[in-house]
Swiss-Prot record:
Transmembrane segments: 10-30, 62-82, 102-122, 151-172, 200-220, 259-277
Residues in the Mitochondrial matrix compartment per record: 31-61, 123-150, 221-258
Single GO MF descriptor: L-ornithine transmembrane transporter activity
Name of protein: Mitochondrial substrate carrier family protein S
Organism, scientific name: Dictyostelium discoideum (Social amoeba)
Keyword Transmembrane found: yes
Subcellular locations according to the entry: Mitochondrion inner membrane
Encoding gene (name): mcfS
Chain's role: Mitochondrial solute carriers shuttle metabolites, nucleotides, and cofactors through the mitochondrial inner membrane. Mediates the transport of acylcarnitines of different length across the mitochondrial inner membrane from the cytosol to the mitochondrial matrix for their oxidation by the mitochondrial fatty acid-oxidation pathway.
Length: 285
């Protein structure tokens, strides 16, 4: 992959990450609160309580943490995906199979996890702060306190489930996206890889890719959220231990707590991300 193409992927990924974040963050706040609540609570009740006690801004709690982090993470993700596709491609005239796209997406997700873990850690800690005394004054204060309590290791609390989610999730994410794109290109008689799709096709492809990403390994994300809001300087509880505890208390339903707002969020957020990504790539030439 040329340096120029890599730079374009990074720039487009950065802008796409911001679009995804602002579109989906309110739903993400509800997701994290449902996942980490000590008592079962409905989506609408959680939404109403947030608006009632914290105002509309409560839905955007923790948004400053992932803003620059997610922009950087999506830049790494798309640049990594582009690089992996080049490594897997036999020659320029042979398109990648969907399976190869899945592998490229999975390994790109592993790289993005390095950026994503501390960003999501801070975001989750801030999102579960509701009314009453606030331990963290903001994103920077939260990160500083985490580093004081646990050092770099503390900042990477939840790293293992994040890698698992990002590897498997991005395999599903990019393979679904590429499958949908190829379907629409065949339907519109646009066989070449460089042929542009219309906006509705990009929205559907990106939205379905996002839904696949969250569905394929959702219980691991629930465990990740639980692990990341747990505090202390000691080692994090294992994914298996957390999943067993959730299952013993709430059954299968507990493993999918917050799934509905996640899926509702995933379609518009990822539709926005891929549409903006493709638009920026087009503008950059």
């Amino acid at each position: 992959m040329s340096t120029e193409r890599g730079l374009k992927d990074s720039i487009a990924g950065t802008v796409a990450g911001a679009a995804c974040l602002f579109t989906g963050h309110p739903f993400d706040t509800i997701r994290v609160r449902l996942q980490t609540s000590n008592t079962p609570i409905g989506i609408m009740e959680c939404f109403r309580n947030t608006i009632k006690y914290e105002g509309f801004s409560g839905l955007y709690k923790g948004v400053t943490s992932p803003l620059f982090g997610m922009m950087f993470e999506t830049a790494v993700l798309f640049a990594g995906y582009g690089q992996m596709k080049v490594l897997l491609q036999k020659d320029e005239n042979t398109p990648l199979t969907v399976g190869q796209c899945a592998i490229a997406g999975g390994f790109a997700g592993v790289g993005a996890s390095v950026v994503l873990t501390p960003v999501e850690l801070v975001k989750c800690r801030l999102q579960v702060q509701t009314t009453g005394p606030q331990k963290y004054k903001g994103s920077l204060d939260c990160l500083v306190q985490i580093l004081k309590e646990g050092g770099i290791r503390g900042a990477y609390r939840g790293f293992t489930p994040t890698i698992a989610r990002e590897f498997v999730g991005n395999m599903a994410f990019f393979s679904t996206y590429e499958t949908c794109k190829r379907y629409f290109k065949n339907k519109e008689n646009k066989p070449n890889d460089d042929d542009e799709l219309n906006l509705p096709a990009l929205i559907i492809s990106g939205g379905l890719g996002g839904m696949a990403y969250w569905t394929v390994l959702y219980p691991v994300d629930v465990a990740k959220s639980k692990i990341q809001i747990s505090e202390g300087a000691g080692p994090s509880p294992s994914i298996v231990k957390v999943l067993k505890e959730i299952y013993s208390k709430e059954g299968v339903k507990g493993l999918f707590r917050g799934y509905t707002p996640t899926i509702i969020r995933s379609f518009p957020a990822n539709a926005a991300m891929f549409s903006v990504y493709e638009l920026v790539i087009k503008l950059l030439g």
